[in-house]
Amino acid sequence: YLENKNTNLEAFNRYRKLPTIIETSEKWDVLRADAIGDEAATQFVFVGSGHEYQRAKEMKATNGTFILPLEYPKPFQSQDLMNVEDLDVADLKHWELAPYNAVYMAKEKVPFALTMYKLKDKKSFLDKLRDLNKKGLSKEEILQSITEKPAQILQVSSLGNLNKGSMANFIIVSDDLFMKESVIYENWVFGKQNIINRMPDTDVRGDYQVQLNNQTYDLKIKGKSTKPEAEITQNDKKGKIKLAVADYKMAMEVKLPNDSVQNYRVMLPLTDYKNRTGIAIDKDGRNIPFTIKYVKAFEPELKKDDKAKTDEPGKIWYPFSAFGAEQLASQQ
Protein backbone atom coordinates (compact mmCIF):
# COMPACT_ATOMS: atom_id res chain seq x y z
CA TYR A 1 0.00 0.00 0.00
CA LEU A 2 2.90 2.36 0.70
CA GLU A 3 3.93 2.08 -2.94
CA ASN A 4 0.38 2.54 -4.27
CA LYS A 5 -1.32 4.99 -1.96
CA ASN A 6 -4.92 5.87 -2.67
CA THR A 7 -5.06 9.56 -1.88
CA ASN A 8 -8.83 9.61 -2.39
CA LEU A 9 -9.38 7.05 0.36
CA GLU A 10 -6.92 8.82 2.62
CA ALA A 11 -8.78 12.10 2.20
CA PHE A 12 -12.09 10.31 2.70
CA ASN A 13 -10.92 8.80 5.99
CA ARG A 14 -9.33 12.04 7.16
CA TYR A 15 -12.56 14.02 6.80
CA ARG A 16 -15.18 11.36 7.47
CA LYS A 17 -16.41 13.24 10.54
CA LEU A 18 -17.62 15.98 8.22
CA PRO A 19 -20.92 15.63 6.33
CA THR A 20 -20.43 13.76 3.06
CA ILE A 21 -22.57 15.13 0.24
CA ILE A 22 -22.95 13.27 -3.03
CA GLU A 23 -24.80 14.50 -6.12
CA THR A 24 -27.08 12.14 -8.02
CA SER A 25 -28.45 12.34 -11.55
CA GLU A 26 -31.46 10.05 -11.12
CA LYS A 27 -33.29 8.05 -8.45
CA TRP A 28 -31.33 4.81 -8.88
CA ASP A 29 -28.09 6.74 -8.32
CA VAL A 30 -29.27 7.33 -4.77
CA LEU A 31 -29.65 3.63 -4.05
CA ARG A 32 -26.30 2.79 -5.66
CA ALA A 33 -24.54 5.54 -3.70
CA ASP A 34 -26.24 4.44 -0.49
CA ALA A 35 -24.96 0.88 -1.00
CA ILE A 36 -21.42 2.22 -1.39
CA GLY A 37 -21.89 4.33 1.72
CA ASP A 38 -23.04 1.29 3.68
CA GLU A 39 -19.87 -0.58 2.69
CA ALA A 40 -17.78 2.37 3.88
CA ALA A 41 -19.87 2.81 7.06
CA THR A 42 -20.79 6.31 5.89
CA GLN A 43 -24.19 7.95 5.61
CA PHE A 44 -24.32 10.21 2.57
CA VAL A 45 -26.35 13.37 2.15
CA PHE A 46 -27.88 13.16 -1.33
CA VAL A 47 -28.26 16.09 -3.72
CA GLY A 48 -31.40 15.03 -5.55
CA SER A 49 -32.16 15.06 -9.25
CA GLY A 50 -35.86 15.84 -8.89
CA HIS A 51 -36.92 12.23 -9.55
CA GLU A 52 -36.89 11.06 -5.92
CA TYR A 53 -40.70 11.14 -5.60
CA GLN A 54 -40.90 8.18 -8.00
CA ARG A 55 -39.46 5.93 -5.28
CA ALA A 56 -39.98 7.92 -2.09
CA LYS A 57 -40.27 4.83 0.12
CA GLU A 58 -36.89 3.57 -1.09
CA MET A 59 -35.42 7.04 -0.51
CA LYS A 60 -36.71 6.85 3.06
CA ALA A 61 -35.05 3.46 3.53
CA THR A 62 -31.59 4.95 2.87
CA ASN A 63 -31.87 6.89 6.17
CA GLY A 64 -30.22 9.76 4.33
CA THR A 65 -31.04 13.45 4.18
CA PHE A 66 -31.75 14.97 0.77
CA ILE A 67 -31.05 18.35 -0.79
CA LEU A 68 -33.85 18.87 -3.29
CA PRO A 69 -33.65 21.22 -6.31
CA LEU A 70 -36.49 23.51 -7.33
CA GLU A 71 -35.84 23.58 -11.08
CA TYR A 72 -38.55 21.61 -12.88
CA PRO A 73 -39.05 20.49 -16.49
CA LYS A 74 -40.44 23.16 -18.79
CA PRO A 75 -43.69 22.49 -20.68
CA PHE A 76 -43.16 20.69 -23.95
CA GLN A 77 -43.82 22.87 -26.98
CA SER A 78 -44.24 21.64 -30.50
CA GLN A 79 -46.12 23.00 -33.49
CA ASP A 80 -45.62 19.80 -35.44
CA LEU A 81 -48.16 17.08 -34.65
CA MET A 82 -45.71 14.46 -35.89
CA ASN A 83 -43.20 15.55 -33.24
CA VAL A 84 -45.87 15.35 -30.54
CA GLU A 85 -46.28 11.66 -31.27
CA ASP A 86 -42.59 11.18 -30.45
CA LEU A 87 -42.90 12.60 -26.93
CA ASP A 88 -42.18 10.07 -24.21
CA VAL A 89 -45.19 9.60 -21.93
CA ALA A 90 -42.84 9.16 -18.97
CA ASP A 91 -41.36 12.60 -19.70
CA LEU A 92 -44.84 14.12 -19.76
CA LYS A 93 -45.68 12.40 -16.48
CA HIS A 94 -42.47 13.69 -14.91
CA TRP A 95 -43.34 17.22 -16.08
CA GLU A 96 -46.65 16.84 -14.22
CA LEU A 97 -45.26 15.41 -10.98
CA ALA A 98 -41.78 16.94 -10.61
CA PRO A 99 -43.11 20.07 -8.80
CA TYR A 100 -44.53 17.72 -6.13
CA ASN A 101 -41.17 16.08 -5.41
CA ALA A 102 -40.78 17.64 -1.95
CA VAL A 103 -44.45 16.96 -1.14
CA TYR A 104 -44.08 13.23 -1.77
CA MET A 105 -40.83 13.13 0.21
CA ALA A 106 -42.49 14.90 3.14
CA LYS A 107 -45.36 12.39 3.11
CA GLU A 108 -42.81 9.60 3.60
CA LYS A 109 -41.11 11.69 6.33
CA VAL A 110 -37.84 11.85 4.39
CA PRO A 111 -35.67 14.65 5.84
CA PHE A 112 -34.71 17.23 3.22
CA ALA A 113 -33.51 20.76 2.59
CA LEU A 114 -34.46 22.88 -0.41
CA THR A 115 -31.80 24.54 -2.54
CA MET A 116 -31.38 27.26 -5.15
CA TYR A 117 -28.71 25.09 -6.75
CA LYS A 118 -29.58 24.47 -10.43
CA LEU A 119 -32.38 27.06 -10.24
CA LYS A 120 -31.98 29.06 -13.44
CA ASP A 121 -34.09 32.02 -12.33
CA LYS A 122 -32.87 32.78 -8.80
CA LYS A 123 -35.56 35.46 -8.39
CA SER A 124 -38.24 32.76 -8.63
CA PHE A 125 -37.09 31.09 -5.39
CA LEU A 126 -39.78 32.64 -3.19
CA ASP A 127 -42.47 31.90 -5.79
CA LYS A 128 -41.31 28.28 -5.83
CA LEU A 129 -41.68 28.09 -2.04
CA ARG A 130 -45.18 29.59 -2.17
CA ASP A 131 -46.13 27.15 -4.92
CA LEU A 132 -44.97 24.22 -2.78
CA ASN A 133 -47.28 25.44 -0.03
CA LYS A 134 -50.20 25.43 -2.50
CA LYS A 135 -49.23 21.92 -3.52
CA GLY A 136 -49.49 20.59 0.03
CA LEU A 137 -46.19 21.24 1.81
CA SER A 138 -46.83 23.02 5.12
CA LYS A 139 -45.33 26.42 5.86
CA GLU A 140 -43.43 24.93 8.79
CA GLU A 141 -41.90 22.21 6.61
CA ILE A 142 -40.86 24.75 3.99
CA LEU A 143 -39.28 27.13 6.50
CA GLN A 144 -37.43 24.27 8.21
CA SER A 145 -36.12 23.11 4.84
CA ILE A 146 -34.36 26.44 4.24
CA THR A 147 -33.20 27.12 7.81
CA GLU A 148 -32.91 24.27 10.32
CA LYS A 149 -32.31 21.41 7.88
CA PRO A 150 -29.38 22.99 5.99
CA ALA A 151 -27.75 23.84 9.33
CA GLN A 152 -28.23 20.25 10.52
CA ILE A 153 -26.74 18.90 7.30
CA LEU A 154 -23.64 21.06 7.77
CA GLN A 155 -23.58 20.28 11.52
CA VAL A 156 -23.48 23.97 12.41
CA SER A 157 -25.59 24.67 15.49
CA SER A 158 -25.16 28.46 15.23
CA LEU A 159 -27.09 28.66 11.95
CA GLY A 160 -30.73 28.14 11.05
CA ASN A 161 -32.21 29.39 14.31
CA LEU A 162 -32.74 32.54 16.38
CA ASN A 163 -31.27 31.20 19.61
CA LYS A 164 -29.12 33.45 21.75
CA GLY A 165 -25.54 33.32 20.52
CA SER A 166 -26.45 32.10 17.02
CA MET A 167 -25.50 33.94 13.85
CA ALA A 168 -27.93 36.76 13.06
CA ASN A 169 -29.25 35.49 9.73
CA PHE A 170 -32.91 36.35 9.25
CA ILE A 171 -35.38 38.40 7.22
CA ILE A 172 -38.00 40.92 8.33
CA VAL A 173 -41.27 40.85 6.38
CA SER A 174 -44.52 42.80 6.47
CA ASP A 175 -46.87 39.82 6.62
CA ASP A 176 -46.90 36.05 6.36
CA LEU A 177 -44.03 35.24 3.98
CA PHE A 178 -46.34 33.05 1.89
CA MET A 179 -48.81 35.87 1.20
CA LYS A 180 -48.53 37.50 -2.20
CA GLU A 181 -48.85 40.93 -0.53
CA SER A 182 -45.93 40.22 1.79
CA VAL A 183 -42.98 42.60 1.46
CA ILE A 184 -39.43 41.78 2.52
CA TYR A 185 -38.07 44.78 4.41
CA GLU A 186 -34.67 43.61 5.58
CA ASN A 187 -32.26 40.71 5.10
CA TRP A 188 -29.68 40.25 7.87
CA VAL A 189 -26.61 38.18 7.00
CA PHE A 190 -24.07 37.42 9.75
CA GLY A 191 -25.35 40.41 11.70
CA LYS A 192 -25.16 42.83 8.77
CA GLN A 193 -28.35 44.68 7.87
CA ASN A 194 -29.39 44.81 4.20
CA ILE A 195 -32.44 47.00 3.53
CA ILE A 196 -34.53 45.61 0.67
CA ASN A 197 -37.60 47.85 1.01
CA ARG A 198 -38.00 50.83 3.30
CA MET A 199 -40.25 49.90 6.20
CA PRO A 200 -43.30 52.20 6.30
CA ASP A 201 -43.70 54.44 9.32
CA THR A 202 -47.10 52.85 9.98
CA ASP A 203 -49.07 50.03 8.38
CA VAL A 204 -52.39 51.78 7.76
CA ARG A 205 -54.12 48.79 6.15
CA GLY A 206 -57.41 47.68 7.67
CA ASP A 207 -61.15 48.32 7.70
CA TYR A 208 -62.55 51.66 8.84
CA GLN A 209 -65.88 53.42 9.18
CA VAL A 210 -66.05 56.97 7.88
CA GLN A 211 -68.68 59.66 8.48
CA LEU A 212 -68.84 62.53 6.02
CA ASN A 213 -71.74 64.84 5.13
CA ASN A 214 -73.90 63.08 7.72
CA GLN A 215 -73.46 59.79 5.85
CA THR A 216 -71.62 56.63 6.95
CA TYR A 217 -69.23 54.82 4.58
CA ASP A 218 -66.99 51.78 4.71
CA LEU A 219 -63.33 52.43 4.01
CA LYS A 220 -61.00 49.52 3.23
CA ILE A 221 -57.24 50.03 2.94
CA LYS A 222 -55.50 47.01 1.42
CA GLY A 223 -52.63 46.00 -0.86
CA LYS A 224 -48.97 45.98 0.13
CA SER A 225 -47.86 47.77 3.27
CA THR A 226 -45.36 49.79 1.23
CA LYS A 227 -47.98 50.81 -1.35
CA PRO A 228 -51.47 50.63 0.16
CA GLU A 229 -54.64 51.08 -1.87
CA ALA A 230 -58.07 52.20 -0.68
CA GLU A 231 -61.71 51.84 -1.63
CA ILE A 232 -64.77 53.53 -0.14
CA THR A 233 -68.26 52.03 -0.35
CA GLN A 234 -71.79 52.54 0.89
CA ASN A 235 -73.92 49.44 0.65
CA ASP A 236 -73.13 48.11 -2.85
CA LYS A 237 -72.06 51.42 -4.35
CA LYS A 238 -68.39 52.35 -4.76
CA GLY A 239 -66.79 55.73 -4.68
CA LYS A 240 -63.30 56.75 -5.74
CA ILE A 241 -60.40 57.42 -3.45
CA LYS A 242 -56.73 58.29 -3.87
CA LEU A 243 -54.48 57.46 -0.93
CA ALA A 244 -50.96 58.61 -0.11
CA VAL A 245 -48.92 57.81 3.00
CA ALA A 246 -45.71 59.76 3.59
CA ASP A 247 -43.94 61.98 6.10
CA TYR A 248 -46.00 60.59 8.99
CA LYS A 249 -49.24 61.70 7.32
CA MET A 250 -52.06 59.93 5.50
CA ALA A 251 -53.73 61.96 2.75
CA MET A 252 -56.94 61.03 0.95
CA GLU A 253 -58.81 62.52 -1.98
CA VAL A 254 -62.36 61.18 -1.94
CA LYS A 255 -65.31 61.03 -4.30
CA LEU A 256 -68.29 59.61 -2.46
CA PRO A 257 -70.39 56.78 -3.96
CA ASN A 258 -73.49 58.99 -4.31
CA ASP A 259 -71.70 62.16 -5.43
CA SER A 260 -69.61 62.06 -8.61
CA VAL A 261 -69.10 65.84 -8.65
CA GLN A 262 -67.77 66.82 -5.25
CA ASN A 263 -64.20 66.07 -4.11
CA TYR A 264 -63.06 65.95 -0.51
CA ARG A 265 -59.51 66.15 0.76
CA VAL A 266 -58.49 64.75 4.15
CA MET A 267 -55.13 64.87 5.91
CA LEU A 268 -54.52 62.73 9.01
CA PRO A 269 -51.40 62.45 11.20
CA LEU A 270 -50.15 58.87 11.52
CA THR A 271 -49.76 59.40 15.24
CA ASP A 272 -53.55 59.55 15.55
CA TYR A 273 -55.35 58.31 12.46
CA LYS A 274 -57.41 55.30 13.60
CA ASN A 275 -60.04 57.14 15.61
CA ARG A 276 -60.24 60.82 14.86
CA THR A 277 -62.75 63.60 14.40
CA GLY A 278 -61.67 66.42 12.16
CA ILE A 279 -62.53 68.11 8.91
CA ALA A 280 -62.51 67.34 5.20
CA ILE A 281 -62.13 70.14 2.68
CA ASP A 282 -64.43 70.10 -0.34
CA LYS A 283 -63.55 71.48 -3.79
CA ASP A 284 -64.96 74.88 -2.83
CA GLY A 285 -62.66 75.10 0.18
CA ARG A 286 -65.37 74.55 2.78
CA ASN A 287 -64.69 72.60 5.96
CA ILE A 288 -66.90 69.52 6.27
CA PRO A 289 -67.10 67.49 9.53
CA PHE A 290 -65.23 64.20 9.12
CA THR A 291 -64.88 61.19 11.43
CA ILE A 292 -62.86 58.01 10.94
CA LYS A 293 -63.12 54.94 13.17
CA TYR A 294 -60.89 51.86 13.02
CA VAL A 295 -62.90 48.61 12.74
CA LYS A 296 -60.47 45.72 12.24
CA ALA A 297 -57.02 44.76 11.01
CA PHE A 298 -56.18 44.04 7.38
CA GLU A 299 -57.03 40.58 6.09
CA PRO A 300 -55.85 39.63 2.59
CA GLU A 301 -58.60 38.82 0.14
CA LEU A 302 -58.46 35.24 -1.05
CA LYS A 303 -58.82 34.84 -4.78
CA LYS A 304 -60.79 31.94 -6.22
CA ASP A 305 -57.56 30.09 -6.92
CA ASP A 306 -56.43 30.59 -3.31
CA LYS A 307 -59.73 29.33 -1.92
CA ALA A 308 -59.46 26.11 -3.87
CA LYS A 309 -58.21 22.98 -2.16
CA THR A 310 -54.58 22.00 -2.30
CA ASP A 311 -53.55 20.87 -5.77
CA GLU A 312 -53.86 17.11 -6.13
CA PRO A 313 -51.24 15.48 -8.36
CA GLY A 314 -51.83 12.47 -10.56
CA LYS A 315 -50.79 8.99 -9.51
CA ILE A 316 -47.20 7.76 -9.67
CA TRP A 317 -46.63 4.87 -12.06
CA TYR A 318 -44.68 1.69 -11.23
CA PRO A 319 -42.52 1.34 -13.23
CA PHE A 320 -42.40 4.98 -14.26
CA SER A 321 -43.32 4.41 -17.90
CA ALA A 322 -46.29 4.46 -20.24
CA PHE A 323 -47.66 1.11 -19.10
CA GLY A 324 -46.86 1.44 -15.41
CA ALA A 325 -49.41 0.58 -12.73
CA GLU A 326 -50.63 2.92 -9.99
CA GLN A 327 -49.70 0.35 -7.35
CA LEU A 328 -46.28 -1.17 -6.86
CA ALA A 329 -46.48 -4.87 -7.72
CA SER A 330 -46.05 -7.14 -4.70
CA GLN A 331 -43.62 -10.03 -4.72
CA GLN A 332 -45.19 -13.45 -5.14
For the regions a language model picked out, list residue spans one by one.
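C-terminal cap of metal-dependent C-N hydrolases
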Residues: 167-200
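Central antiparallel beta-sheet cores of small beta-barrel/beta-sandwich binding domains
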Residues: 210-271
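His/Asp/Glu-enriched, well-ordered alpha-helical/loop segment
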Residues: 19, 65-173
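Transmembrane beta-barrel architecture of outer membranes
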Residues: 54, 67-69, 98-102, 107, ...
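Short, charged, surface-exposed secondary-structure boundary motifs
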Residues: 55-58, 75-82, 183
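Histidine/acidic residue-rich metal-binding segments in metalloenzymes
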Residues: 1-45, 49-66, 96-109, 127, ...
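Soluble extramembrane regions of membrane proteins in the secretory/endomembrane system
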Residues: 287-294
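Tryptophan-anchored aromatic micro-motifs
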Residues: 199-220, 227-236, 275-287, 299-301, ...
